[in-house]
UniProtKB/Swiss-Prot annotation:
Description of how the protein assembles with itself and partners: Heterotetramer.
Control of this protein's activity: Activated by 3'phosphoglycerate, inhibited by orthophosphate. Allosteric regulation.
Name recorded for this polypeptide: Glucose-1-phosphate adenylyltransferase small subunit 1, chloroplastic
Enzyme class per UniProt: transferase
NCBIfam families recorded: glgC, PRK02862.1
Function text: This protein plays a role in synthesis of starch. It catalyzes the synthesis of the activated glycosyl donor, ADP-glucose from Glc-1-P and ATP.
Reaction catalyzed: alpha-D-glucose 1-phosphate + ATP + H(+) = ADP-alpha-D-glucose + diphosphate
Keyword annotations: Allosteric enzyme, ATP-binding, Chloroplast, Nucleotide-binding, Nucleotidyltransferase, Plastid, Starch biosynthesis, Transferase, Transit peptide
Gene Ontology CC: one annotated term: chloroplast
InterPro entries with a match to the protein in the record: ADP-Glc_PPase, ADP_Glu_pyroP_CS, NTP_transferase_dom, Nucleotide-diphossugar_trans, Trimer_LpxA-like_sf
Presequence positions on this chain: 1-59
UniProt organism field: Vicia faba
Primary location group: plastid
Pathway(s) this gene product operates in, as recorded in its UniProt entry: Glycan biosynthesis; starch biosynthesis
Length: 508
């Protein structure tokens, strides 16, 4: 099982009547004492005005058992906005025919299912997904997976895609994350909500957004930024911040390098990390997830920064510079930005890790939803399968599979060896008549042919791998672009393009 994510508010007593608030979310890696909550008369109640028992700055609440007391509740007061990302050039060729959030994940899912499921599990049922590139498969998936009137007619829930469009007032496409939201502000402001929840469509994590929003309200923030500890190797790829003892962001630097990077080092024991982990992770990085009060969003994008295109590099630092209350919400659970082929590969193979996977799809309390496909159970005939995840509807015959993820409808023939590989599967089954027709033409069916060996690779959907093929990168090539031949190599990982044909006997 994955780490159980908990969250709450650290309260530190002050000599004045006000109190300091440090918002946070923790995994089992954080430790501390409970923050007790009681009703006004001292007795526990289901709905209440909560009083906090003040503890030391290092204390962390065990909010696994704590209540979230949002009033009004999230289904009525929060609008979820998921940013579909840009062209996804670093994930190419997986984004050749699909938007980044539509990339398959974990055998049965797509990336977009992660933020949408987090929203639904957090009682947020009004969700827009903004996209600009290759949105056909994303539209299709969302319409099939998440029906209209999500959450019942009372809540009037929905998951809708908003594609970039031109208008007489604005002939330009989306210029960045903030510009994408600005172009649809006219639609977002029609919703009678208190906050906008801004999310990314290409992250893998599990978070209770209700606790995130509650922390935003309790700290009386204009903007709350989800943040997590980060090591120096990856820090240059993120926006980094410094916070004061109240959890307020006092300095923000987008993707700093050199001396600017060194200047952003902080003592992350304030997040609840022990000394050893704090030394390994001396930075606080933005996760690209924000809660922004509605009136603040309208003011920032229309009046204060009408030319700003990006939240991370322009709007958030700008809001800090003009004195707005920008708070940090500290998170220490599993989180992965799936922006590159290597990160995508590692995130998928991470679900096979034992004894505890990096991310679990088996969490009963926070399930990940997806499109119901009504496929039959997978069939394994004399197969040797170790440390792997197998999707629905697969047919696997007398082969060996080790430390791999096998996507839905995958067909793997006799004698094949699959190691350290992600197979995305297929969109449809081929009939025996189809296979005879292909054989007569000298082609091969969808799936993995007899006696083929695939190691450390990603095989996209509907790929046709012939017999006796070896995809093992024996020369350890790190980068190669062979699109006409049906594959790319990035970071040493061979990626077979969607619908590609790899003839029998090929060695890659």
């Amino acid at each position: 099982m994955s780490s159980i994510v908990t969250s709450g508010v650290i309260n530190v007593p002050r000599s004045s009547s006000s109190s300091k608030n440090l918002s946070f979310s923790s995994s089992s890696q954080l430790s501390g004492n409970k923050i007790l909550t009681v009703s006004g008369n001292g007795a526990p109640r289901g709905r209440c005005t909560l009083k906090h028992v003040f503890l030391t700055p290092k204390a962390v609440s065990d909010s696994q058992n704590s209540q979230t007391c949002l009033d009004p509740d999230a289904s009525r007061s929060v609008l979820g906005i998921i940013l579909g990302g840009g062209a996804g050039t670093r994930l190419y060729p997986l984004t050749k025919k699909r938007a980044k959030p539509a990339v398959p994940l974990g055998a049965n899912y797509r990336l977009i299912d992660i933020p949408v499921s987090n929203c639904l599990n957090s009682n947020i049922s009004k969700i827009y997904v903004l996209t600009q590139f290759n949105s056909a498969s994303l539209n299709r998936h969302l319409s099939r997976a998440y029906a209209s009137n999500l959450g019942g007619y009372k809540n009037e829930g929905f998951v809708e895609v908003l594609a970039a469009q031109q208008s007489p007032e604005n002939p330009n496409w989306f210029q960045g994350t903030a510009d994408a939201v600005r172009q649809y502000l006219w639609l977002f402001e029609e919703h009678n909500v208190l906050e906008y929840l801004i999310l990314a469509g290409d992250h893998l994590y599990r978070m209770d957004y209700e606790k995130f929003i509650q922390a935003h309200r309790e700290s009386d923030a204009d903007i709350t930024v989800a943040a997590l500890p980060m090591d120096e190797k990856r820090a240059t790829a993120f926006g980094l911040m410094k916070i004061d003892e109240e959890g307020r962001i006092i300095e923000f630097a987008e993707k700093p390098k050199g001396e600017q990077l060194k200047a952003m080092k902080v003592d992350t024991t304030i997040l609840g990390l022990d000394d050893e982990r704090a030394k390994e992770m001396p930075f606080i990085a933005s996760m690209g997830i924000y809660v922004i009060s509605k009136n603040v969003m309208l003011d920032l994008l229309r009046d204060k920064f009408p030319g700003a295109n990006d939240f991370g590099s322009e709007v958030i630092p700008g809001a800090t510079s003009i004195g707005m209350r920008v708070q940090a919400y500290l998170y220490d659970g599993y989180w992965e930005d799936i922006g590159t082929i290597e990160a995508f590969y590692n995130a998928n193979l991470g679900i096979t890790k034992k004894p505890v996977p990096d991310f679990s799809f088996y969490d009963r309390s926070s399930p990940i939803y997806t499109q119901p496909r009504y496929l039959p159970p997978s069939k394994m005939l004399d197969a040797d399968i170790t440390d792997s995840v197998i999707g629905e509807g697969c047919v696997i015959k007398n082969c060996k599979i080790f430390h791999s993820v096998v996507g839905l409808r995958s067909c793997i023939s006799e004698g094949a060896i699959i190691e350290d590989t992600l197979l995305m599967g297929a969109d449809y089954y081929e009939t025996e008549a189809d296979k005879r027709f292909l054989a007569a033409k000298g082609s091969v069916p969808i799936g993995i042919g007899k006696n083929s060996h695939i190691k450390r690779a990603i095989v996209d959907k509907n790929a046709r791998i012939g017999e006796n093929v070896k995809i093992i990168n024996s020369d350890n090539v790190q980068e190669a672009a062979r699109e006409t031949e049906g594959y790319f190599i990035k970071s040493g990982i061979v990626t077979i393009i969607k619908d590609a044909l790899i003839p029998s006997g090929t060695v890659l």
